[in-house]
């Protein structure tokens, strides 16, 4: 396997660099006087100075010795500045979009996929181009500490006609979303102008436009504004300038080429070609250097890696005694053994409220019958909900609505009998997806049923009219879980320690996308899980405002430990391990608060770890030996160059990446590149000294990676393994849904 990571070769452990004491005034003065030849950056109370192009005799500041890896932040800043200045020297016609992550557009005509179809007077003014991104990382793979560059490729619109030009062409700008472009002082022709999404144009007078922003109406020069680079906005302009037919043709080319440009095999080839151009000249490595003796080269071939550990697919358990197990697919276990909690599940005869539009009652009742009793000729759903999940009698109470309006649905819900239903199944039209969150009946119906403590299973009219064994099988699984059942659990990893796993997710609620928009982050604290994946303390599921999440977490944690210690018979002196799956890096002050809480629960020895799980990172894994797999009825291979599920690399003692979707898990060849998730154990940052805390932290990355991998098999929304563990999947869903309701 190979990473999109190109190692940097530094042949010294220490280096010398000039420094001065930091002040804002002095830093500004130095940049003003010497910015053409020197780089200046701050670290703490010190200004660090790199002489790239001035004479060696020009000295500024006093010389200081630094360790290449012990002072990694300083080394990293020096590498970034030298890379930037060398790039500008070698490619003077390229203006980078950003300093860091370093981004620039390809200058090759072949990388603009709409160039040949555009009219001549729009060529190079409008484009859909390859955007190249370079980021720096310090890794310690297999004990080898080194820096390296990560290369990624995206495709972005270019539209460099100002609103002044569009206005002169009589293009209607009223109501159009616009960006304000500002060239930062001293960076003309060095960096592209900074663009900020400010709002919509409401009025134009002469050379100025009034823009509705989050600060109210503000006035801008038309020459400083550009339309927001979205498919919708650019499509509208192309229709105006050419024709609807031509605009549709241009946009269709982009859509048709999407599978090709994101093909993993081609992506790998493009990344390696970019590395050769950036890091070599006619096959010879480029020497990135300054006049002070700091220098490095970069490998033009990506780093080859092997799996750090073997991640194992868990065994699925279907009875409390762990005598009924299966090692392949949990669906096979359910068909053979029934659900894990069959002997103790107390809702054996669920009453289910079913609501549909009167025009689809025939198909809806057929759907319910097939859901309950199964499809006799099918492979996966012969038994149906009732027999597969060992239920005695599933009773449906079907009610009709005249129209698909909120009032009609709420009326049907209010009419349910005194015998409160255990669950509701509600048919809704596909058109609900086009509603805004605020007016969407889906969220309002869900909120009403939530207030009545009735779980709900929505099904779209399309599925009701055209359901298969696959959709019925998944819906039955979801229904059993929503009734409170446990379809299967995982084996606990043998340990004398007690363990709880807590998921904390989040979602952003923004008024709009304009700069300065009012936004709220909603945090969802999911049900606590035991190490075998059983959900504990269901009443603790909630969402809270971001500023209150840590206080709520501590309260839930304290109550949960008290409750579970009694329920599970913990003894004084037991070691209890708390694994938090959390959406954000934790602050040092939050480590302090947790450690204080732990000291307050003195009867147990508590160890804990905060772990972030994310797919928003720049790292990719390639397997050049993977030639792809074909699906039944489709000869086009999918997943070329994508590693198998469970492939993994430990980037350092705290960070690893794990491939969750391999070639076999992809649905089609159109999926494109599948990124691994990044798992990172969070530790206090900076000059932090708390010896007591160090003894409380749990550092076993191998254990945590295996547990997270196993928990991806615990999403009861589907029988297929998920990309993220159930802890994060459900906590993110909770915060998203409750935030919208």
Q: Whereabouts are the PLM-identified features?
A:
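Long, contiguous domain-sized segments
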Residues: 1-196, 213-217, 383-384, 399-404, ...
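Extended, highly charged clamp/arch subdomains and adjacent linkers
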Residues: 4-23, 27-30, 176-457, 461, ...
